[in-house]
């Protein structure tokens, strides 16, 4: 970890800096003029004074003569402002609460009669697992309870899982990496300089904001594929608009996510769509329509239920006949009944994917690439995926090997969780460093104590990493090699330790002060995360390309690709609009010096 940062600094739920660098637009309202003049000299002196009631006033003067007094209003900061500001590393608490919160959702529901909005909701896999763990019910029953809450009690029209958006994201992510790997050049916005290092995932908005604001040299290496949240939002709004024959601006999309930074992701300018809207005068005006209108977390949903007793997620008793479906409908029938009529692949619309609990991007890249090679004539029975552990449980590497005993590495991917590991990776990828061949060799094949390697293998096995080998099967030569994420084809990066299953918006473990449990709080939290992971893994699986069905899996992937092309043609949406995003370095607008006491006071102790 950098000596300039402390553990407190890495919190992804922080307040805006005292010296916010976003300029404020001045308002000419609430003005009083003591000396009138035909013209206002903007070059005059301006003072800020406090009146007798404590209100701030802006007083304009020229030659000591007072011309105009403006009553100042409180500064308003939007999510878009935060994205363009370099003052905070990730998100700002007050801004998130003000614009994406359960209170805003309640206000929107209360004003439904005036706005005529149609409400739809999408729910992430990790949030479902967190809620199921908190209420000690199965994933199936939690899904029924969520459908009951949003459809019957809160008046939502449709509810969907994020599985379709995730699978399309996984496929396009793998396509981008494979294209660069096979062609040897950048694709999808990745320039030629990125060919010397791995493609870095951009699914985690906390990591993306960190890169944009502190390490802009990393941006060319980042994947430009959108996250499941944003793809789902685009699909859901267009299909709902088509199904109900209404404008997309009349649709309010709520997304339930495991992370607070997902709120900022929904405010990125490239996820808005311009739509013509008829006004009362029959004139048409362009309005910006976001793919996601509001993002709340599982933790915030619990807060909403506590503040609004008219809503109940779990009935006092849980008889099957009182749940959605009445105990006689299958889950597929239930999902179909409450999704838009034109929602595709309904049987897998709430299903899970193999790999990490953050979506399995690294693992699915390897399996999709394996299927791509099978279609080119490779023997599917000769593939294996080997696990290489890192120096801590939050970093590991997977290698796609071929040809039995004479194994050849065809592809590799790594998973990196937590800011400590992210900082180490970013440091290795910094330009003009590590050019020495000897240094590279040493880094790639760093030796470690075999006992430590066995311990990491045991931890990985217990955590259920995909296709991991048992300790006895791990080759001794492999065990002496430490995972190096800077040398792989692709890196799945998540800001939170343990990934999205431990996102900042997930429901926390019970506190030792409020329970009779005598275990240390850290141990309780560890057990809680493992239990939530078990709930997550209990979600029915639908692999895009599992090895056991490698002959048919490519056809499944083709089905998703063909459907997405039909969707783009039907709604006149480009491939870039549906699947691609872009990133820009955030320029620092103020120059700070650690030797300047005044600057240090303005910035505060956080950064």
Swiss-Prot record:
InterPro entries: Cytosolic_Fe-S_CAF, Fe_hydrogenase, Fe_hydrogenase_lsu_C. GO terms for biological process: iron-sulfur cluster assembly. Residues 432-447 have a biased composition (Low complexity). [4Fe-4S] cluster 1 binds at residues 20, 82, 85, 88. It comes from the Eukaryota. Component of the cytosolic Fe/S protein assembly machinery. Required for maturation of extramitochondrial Fe/S proteins. May play a role in the transfer of pre-assembled Fe/S clusters to target apoproteins. This is Cytosolic Fe-S cluster assembly factor NAR1. It comes from Candida albicans (strain SC5314 / ATCC MYA-2876) (Yeast). The gene is NAR1.
């Amino acid at each position: 970890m950098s000596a300039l940062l402390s553990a407190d600094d890495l919190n992804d739920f922080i307040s805006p800096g005292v010296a916010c660098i976003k300029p404020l637009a001045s308002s000419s309202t609430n003005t009083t003029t003591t000396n009138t003049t035909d013209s206002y000299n903007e070059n005059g002196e301006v003072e800020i004074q406090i009146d007798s009631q404590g209100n701030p006033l802006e007083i304009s003067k020229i030659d000591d003569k007072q011309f105009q007094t403006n009553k100042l209003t409180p500064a308003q900061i939007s999510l878009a402002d935060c994205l363009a500001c370099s003052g905070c590393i990730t998100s700002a608490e007050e801004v998130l609460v003000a614009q994406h919160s359960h209170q805003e959702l309640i206000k929107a529901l209360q004003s439904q009669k005036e706005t005529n909005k149609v409400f739809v909701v999408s729910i992430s896999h990790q949030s479902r697992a967190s809620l199921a763990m908190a209420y000690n019910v199965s994933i199936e029953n939690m899904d029924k309870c969520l459908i009951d809450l949003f459809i019957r009690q809160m008046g939502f029209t449709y509810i969907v899982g994020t599985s379709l958006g995730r699978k399309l994201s996984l496929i396009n992510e793998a396509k981008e990496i494979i294209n660069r790997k096979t062609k040897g050049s950048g694709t999808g916005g990745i320039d030629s300089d990125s060919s010397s290092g791995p493609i870095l995932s951009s699914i985690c908005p906390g990591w993306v904001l960190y890169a944009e604001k502190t390490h802009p040299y990393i941006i060319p290496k980042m994947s430009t594929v959108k996250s499941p949240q944003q793809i789902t939002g685009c699909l859901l709004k267009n299909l709902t608009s088509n199904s109900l024959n209404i404008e997309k601006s009349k649709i309010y999309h709520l997304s339930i996510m495991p992370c607070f930074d997902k709120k900022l992701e929904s405010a990125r300018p490239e996820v808005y769509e311009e739509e013509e809207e008829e006004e009362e005068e029959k004139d048409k005006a362009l309005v910006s329509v976001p793919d996601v209108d509001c993002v709340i977390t599982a933790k915030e949903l619990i807060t909403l239920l506590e503040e609004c007793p008219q809503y109940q997620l779990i009935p006092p008793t849980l008889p099957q006949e009182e749940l959605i479906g009445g105990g006689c409908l299958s889950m597929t029938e239930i999902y179909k009944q409450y999704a838009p009529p034109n929602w595709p692949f309904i049987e897998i619309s709430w299903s899970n994917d193999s790999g990490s609990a953050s979506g399995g991007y690294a693992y699915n890249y390897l399996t999709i690439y394996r299927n791509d090679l099978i279609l080119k004539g490779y023997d599917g029975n000769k593939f294996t995926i080997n696990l290489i552990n890192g120096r801590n449980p939050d970093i590991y590497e997977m290698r796609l090997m071929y040809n039995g005993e004479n194994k050849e590495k065809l592809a590799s991917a790594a998973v990196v969780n937590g800011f400590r590991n992210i900082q180490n990776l970013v440091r290795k990828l910094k330009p003009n460093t590590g050019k020495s061949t000897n240094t590279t060799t040493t880094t790639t094949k760093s030796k470690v104590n075999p006992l430590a390697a066995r311990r990491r293998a045991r931890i990985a096995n217990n955590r259920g990493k995909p296709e991991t080998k048992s300790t006895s099967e791990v080759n001794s030569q492999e065990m002496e090699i430490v995972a190096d994420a800077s040398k792989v084809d692709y890196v799945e990066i998540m800001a939170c330790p343990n990934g999205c299953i431990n996102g900042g918006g997930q429901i926390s473990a019970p506190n030792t002060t409020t329970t009779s449990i005598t275990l240390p709080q850290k141990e309780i939290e560890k057990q809680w995360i493992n239990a939530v992971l078990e709930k997550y893994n209990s979600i029915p699986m639908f692999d895009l390309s599992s090895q056991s069905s490698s002959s048919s899996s490519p056809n499944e992937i083709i089905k998703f690709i063909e459907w997405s092309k039909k969707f783009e043609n039907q709604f006149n949406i480009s491939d870039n609009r549906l699947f691609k995003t872009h990133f820009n370095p955030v320029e620092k607008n103020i120059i700070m010096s650690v030797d300047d006491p005044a600057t240090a006071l303005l910035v505060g102790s956080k950064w």
